[in-house]
């Protein structure tokens, strides 16, 4: 018997996704003035990545990028696309942003409770998506994505910075695989440091 429904792919445009991410971040009114200054500083640290992500996502308003701070622009782009790696989209960008700040989940709320704008790594980068989407969501990954990400546990004796770079590369490779090469991956100048 034939299915009664025709599957339809609904894709959220990148520029709208970035607006939604920015609107999902709620800065406490008492901290708003200070945060605007800090967000400007954080935004200045990622000029190259910001301009490349803006070009790829067709975002022409720099305020959109400032509004997603402390989320690195590339992490935001990957976050927007990551739900496609899950069998039924159990983990979405909004789940990541709004999940409670428990140590075992290590999503956005955990990050803002445990990191700050004056830390050595003040931005939530692509490698920091690993715990939420791989460690805690591995069972819901499609097999092709799991195959790529399962490469990481096989690696031994890596330094922490090497682990961060490998996690970022594997996440980007997995998302690129899922989307059939439609995600503009970072250039060589960026893969040496997942924060820039």
Model-assigned labels for residue ranges:
Residues 194-196:
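Hydrophobic alpha-helical segments, chiefly the membrane-spanning helices
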Residues 150-188, 192:
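Terminal-proximal interaction/regulatory segments of ATP-powered molecular machines
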Residues 92-155:
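Long, low-complexity, charged/polar intrinsically disordered regions in eukaryotic proteins
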Residues 37-40, 44, 147-150, 170:
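Polar/charged alpha-helical tracts
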Residues 1-110, 122:
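Conserved P-loop NTPase catalytic core
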